[in-house]
């Protein structure tokens, strides 16, 4: 038996891999099954294309054998196998992969058809995370000699000649004492279903089967119950997403959703797409019928599983799809995705970026089709996921217009939500302006906002956005196509000379009252001024967007830290035509003016969805004013 040293500083690399490279030990099974799948793929390719292998029997199969007494776990395949040179090159050199070298020798259609997974040569060594000794018996197809490779993961390995009936590879792992969980058939089956359920070859394993006792007609036991060992297939060996969608029934789609989403509820919809060209990939995305419980948590669990040639790579990579589509469940599978050395963390690469960008556009396109074809289903979707979708207006500038077209809006002219394309049908084409109002309050309260009175009086429709996210997102959305989006507080209507003169006159007449109100309110307001935008309400609040404090508050809000920054004092605007304001102007009762000032400010705050800090004071003032009025 010849002893050899691992190349490329093996001790250091083995130690790193065993203790640091993988975050969970169970994936050693994934790696070895992936290697077995590669070996079967290679042989299949050679049998089909190479005369030297024409007579080789190709009966693809992977077996997993757990021996609890011997404390060994065996993974066996009927693939291409290895000769001594292959063992030296592929198992003697870390970070060199026979599969990768094999890929380099392929071209054209052969490369497309080779479902080769192991692009890096470290997966095999993951076995040393759980085993103190690994034995590999292998025989290359179309050769006579078999070889035994043995290592304890200590920097050395041995190779000797041996015998083996058929081509293929058998890996026997002598497990560490604390790794007995990997001898449990149910644990192994769970790992296979999680990581390797969809590789193209069947995986078999012995499982205990309980045979109940047989009884005669009188109930007397004639044959005792017993356990029998049954060799069964434990993976599907057929990736649903690789099948033409015309050949998949709705029930099959729903069953697959249940298995990947771990949900008993049916999905709301699904999208199955196969892309061919410079980059080949397949996606199968589902929209759940209900929002995931953790959808608004920072540590939400992504629902997209990444496969490379049907082998599960990760379901914990949030960069696979943008966060505003985090409600999606499903798979991305590609032959063209390069992965880093551990296969657990995706490289930042152009291929993944292209797959992601194209997938996002496809999802948005499918949602747009749903909105047109099935309004009820889309309403259900938007009820569950509309607010999450809005996040894309901020985070995905390139798709902002498409996302806007998917949103549904409340308006002051309708009780039904409408899409933006429907809304702009009634927009003044000479101005091309879309007006909106935001506020963290109820829809009915926001629709009654004093800030909308001048629009209602002119018959102008306005988008009413009463979700908290709207106050953060929409100030950053300034246009849609050729239309400008403008907050109602920033709209200035044209006025004739007579109106301007009348307003100047009123402003001077109410200078005394504005001064008294400001003195009563102090720093609660930045200033008090007359406005001619109001019709039925006595007052409203206005933000001073030139105020540095306002600008800082907006920046902190966009950063998600609005709670750390005090809101800048607003401007209180009064309606000079309102009976209450006129009476206050003519009143000499300082106490009444003081109480009214605070009540009017609180009233304006309530309309804007601001909680009152001094509810008791509000009630006391209200009672005093009512008492004087009776």
Curated annotation (Swiss-Prot):
Record region (A): 1-343
Subcellular location: Cytoplasm
Region listing for C, in residue ranges: 555-630
Disulphide connectivity of cysteines: none
Segments of this protein annotated with the region B: 344-554
Principal localisation: cytoplasm
Name of one Pfam family that matches: HATPase_c_3
Signal sequence, start to end: none
Keywords recorded for this protein, A-Z: ATP-binding, Chaperone, Cytoplasm, Nucleotide-binding, Stress response
GO molecular function list: ATP binding; ATP hydrolysis activity; ATP-dependent protein folding chaperone; unfolded protein binding
Any one GO CC term of the record: cytoplasm
Assembly with partners or alone: Homodimer.
Family, similarity comment: Belongs to the heat shock protein 90 family.
HAMAP family per UniProt: HSP90
Biological role stated in the UniProt entry: Molecular chaperone. Has ATPase activity.
Protein name, per record: Chaperone protein HtpG
């Amino acid at each position: 038996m010849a002893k050899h040293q691992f190349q490329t500083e093996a001790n250091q690399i083995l130690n790193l891999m065993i203790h640091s490279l993988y975050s969970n030990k169970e994936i050693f099974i994934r790696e070895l099954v992936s290697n077995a799948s590669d070996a079967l793929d290679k042989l299949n390719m050679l049998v089909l294309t190479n005369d030297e292998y024409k007579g080789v029997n190709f009966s693809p199969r992977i077996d997993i054998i757990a021996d609890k007494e011997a404390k060994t776990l065996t993974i066996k395949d009927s693939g291409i196998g290895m000769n001594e040179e292959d063992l030296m090159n592929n198992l003697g050199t870390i970070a060199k992969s026979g599969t990768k070298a094999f890929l380099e020798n392929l071209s054209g259609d052969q490369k497309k058809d080779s479902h080769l997974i192991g692009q890096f040569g470290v997966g095999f060594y993951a076995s040393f995370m759980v085993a103190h000794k690994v034995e590999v018996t292998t025989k290359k197809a179309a050769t006579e000699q078999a070889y035994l490779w043995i290592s304890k993961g200590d920097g050395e390995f041995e190779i000797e000649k041996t015998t083996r009936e058929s081509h293929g590879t058998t890996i026997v792992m002598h497990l560490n004492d604390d790794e007995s969980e990997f001898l449990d058939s149910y644990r192994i089956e769970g790992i296979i279903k999680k990581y390797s359920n969809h590789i193209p070859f069947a995986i078999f394993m012995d499982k205990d089967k309980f045979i109940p006792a047989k009884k005669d007609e009188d109930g007397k036991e004639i044959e005792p119950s017993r356990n029998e060992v049954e060799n069964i297939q434990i993976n599907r060996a057929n990736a649903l997403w690789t099948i033409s969608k015309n050949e998949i029934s709705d029930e099959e789609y729903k069953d697959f959703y249940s298995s990947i989403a771990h949900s008993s509820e049916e999905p709301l919809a699904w999208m199955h797409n196969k892309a061919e060209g410079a980059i080949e990939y397949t996606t199968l995305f589902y929209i759940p019928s209900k929002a995931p419980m953790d959808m608004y948590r920072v540590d939400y669990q992504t629902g997209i599983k990444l496969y490379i040639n049907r082998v599960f790579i990760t379901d914990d990579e949030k960069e696979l799809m943008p966060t505003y589509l985090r409600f999606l469940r499903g798979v991305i599978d590609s032959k063209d995705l390069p992965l880093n050395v551990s296969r657990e963390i995706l490289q930042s690469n152009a291929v993944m970026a292209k797959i992601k960008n194209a997938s996002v556009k496809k999802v948005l396109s499918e949602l747009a089709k749903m909105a047109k074809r099935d309004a009820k289903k889309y309403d259900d979707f938007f009820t569950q996921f509309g607010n999450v979708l809005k996040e894309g207006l901020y985070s995905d500038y390139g798709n902002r217009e498409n996302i806007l077209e998917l949103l549904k809006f409340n308006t002051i002219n309708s009780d039904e939500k409408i899409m933006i394309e429907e809304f702009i049908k009634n927009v003044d084409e000479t101005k091309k302006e879309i007006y909106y109002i935001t506020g963290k309050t109820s829809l009915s309260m926001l629709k009654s906002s004093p800030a909308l009175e001048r629009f209602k009086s002119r018959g102008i429709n306005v988008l009413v956005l009463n979700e908290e996210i709207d106050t953060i997102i929409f100030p950053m959305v300034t246009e849609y196509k050729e239309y400008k989006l403008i907050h109602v507080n920033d709209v200035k209507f044209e006025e004739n000379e007579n109106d301007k003169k009348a307003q100047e006159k009123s402003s001077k007449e109410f200078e005394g009252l504005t001064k008294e109100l400001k003195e009563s309110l102090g720093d609660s307001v930045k200033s008090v001024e007359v406005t001619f935008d109001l019709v039925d309400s006595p007052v409203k609040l206005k933000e001073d967007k030139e105020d540095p404090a306002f600008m800082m508050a907006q920046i902190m809000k966009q950063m998600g830290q609005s709670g750390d920054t005090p809101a800048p004092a607003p401007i209180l605007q009064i309606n000079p035509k309102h009976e209450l304001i006129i009476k206050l102007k003519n009143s000499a009762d300082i106490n009444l003016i003081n109480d009214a000032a605070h009540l009017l400010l609180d009233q304006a705050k309530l309309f804007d969805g601001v909680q009152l800090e001094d509810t008791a004071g509000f009630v006391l003032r209200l009672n005093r004013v009512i008492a004087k009025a009776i």
